[in-house]
Amino acid sequence: MEIHTYEKEFFDLLKRISHYSEAVALMHWDSRTGAPKNGSEDRAESIGQLSTDIFNIQTSDRMKELIDVLYERFDDLSEDTKKAVELAKKEYEENKKIPEAEYKEYVILCSKAETAWEEAKGKSDFSLFSPYLEQLIEFNKRFITYWGYQEHPYDALLDLFEPGVTVKVLDQLFAELKEAIIPLVKQVTASGNKPDTSFITKAFPKEKQKELSLYFLQELGYDFDGGRLDETVHPFATTLNRGDVRVTTRYDEKDFRTAIFGTIHECGHAIYEQNIDEALSGTNLSDGASMGIHESQSLFYENFIGRNKHFWTPYYKKIQEASPVQFKDISLDDFVRAINESKPSFIRVEADELTYPLHIIIRYEIEKAIFSNEVSVEDLPSLWNQKYQDYLGITPQTDAEGILQDVHWAGGDFGYFPSYALGYMYAAQLKQKMLEDLPEFDALLERGEFHPIKQWLTEKVHIHGKRKKPLDIIKDATGEELNVRYLIDYLSNKYSNLYLL
């Protein structure tokens, strides 16, 4: 048979996987945006079956045969086909090591655990979730033994989200970050030059917040012909296919920042997905390069655009019009200082730019302890609370504002959290390079012209999908290896100026 016949069959299998994945993504989206609770058990079974079907295709004998044949003629393949075959081989080898029945059991457990987590969070009762968490951890410990690792068991999980990143790499990066940020947080907390934020928590109608969320998505370049905005408990963006990338947010009438910045954050994720090269659609390359690269895009939009004074120069009046009494006597400068306030807080997704990395480092250190067998599930809440006291000087009073605040563990996503901090580092380095290429960056924000910024990010990051590894994307885009100093310098300069340190 000609090589292109094998290629076609290989890509047909990838296309079939993408169809199943779309159905699973739709059910996940539905379950988190108001699907009837009574259907959760059957829905979990459906998700489990479809996920097993995907697993079976990825680990089928035919997939292995096609990968082997294409590897024999590797030099004759196009660059994209080479990348797709390499990725399929990696996934095959990872998945083949997990027994099929065990994988299906795990997927069903994840779906049930998410439902249990939602109830536990609502009641602020860790004991309702801990039996599921115990099982999820045991599954992942078994997976680690199946996959193997070189230095640290946690490396096997980190590689799922951020290929090439290890405990050794993160320990070094996070040590440098902690050394710079913890003293800065203490200085900011002790500063007498704090912004007035009293107006932030005044009533801001939910409907007006929704209108603004829709407006900012449109302005920033999100394509509504290929997406929609919905409400959820824990905001996320999800991709059904390149033409259907959905965004969710959460409204709080006593704090408009939750919805506005949450929406802008998810907008960054969605714009990434909407601008991956169309040629990759239906393949395993039509996805973000890694969780960290994905997070770099959401944090870039949320922080480097959304919290920038130049962004609010043309748009502050929209906020004033939406809630006139609340903002009547508040100047633009006072507004910008208030939305950039830094103070230790319990909730990661609502943390300010300065303290945010510490929320991630806490989760990293706890997950590392879990998979080093240094902590039991029952001791996790107290370990969590102790680290918040040590790093941020505060202690959560309830499980909901402590260990139950994130959905990640319920979905089995151990090893995901470090990607948020890496994404922040990636974003700071990309911003530095963008300022060289687009010195008019601030002027573009003041004019509400986001296309050149989006275009730069698309060319350097979005279009490549999974063609490149995360660290290669950063090196190719910026001309140097990942450097944590860009983030440290950005935070030091910004908060020293804001708090007159």
From Swiss-Prot:
UniProt motif GXXQDXHW: location: 402-409
Residues reported in the UniProt entry to bind Zn(2+): H265, H269, E295
Active site, per annotation: E266 (proton donor/acceptor)
SUPFAM superfamilies: Metalloproteases ('zincins'), catalytic domain
Short sequence motif named HEXXH, residue ranges: 265-269
Cofactor(s) needed: Zn(2+)
Motif (I/NRXXA/SD): 347-352
Entry keywords, A to Z: Carboxypeptidase, Hydrolase, Metal-binding, Metalloprotease, Protease, Zinc
Sequence motif HES/GQ, location on chain: 294-297
GO term, biological process aspect, one: proteolysis
InterPro entries cross-referenced by the UniProt entry: Peptidase_M32_Taq
Statement: the UniProt record of this protein carries the keyword Protease: yes
Subunit structure as annotated in this protein's UniProt entry: Homodimer.
PANTHER family, per database record: CARBOXYPEPTIDASE 1 (PTHR34217:SF1), METAL-DEPENDENT CARBOXYPEPTIDASE (PTHR34217)
Protein name: Carboxypeptidase 1
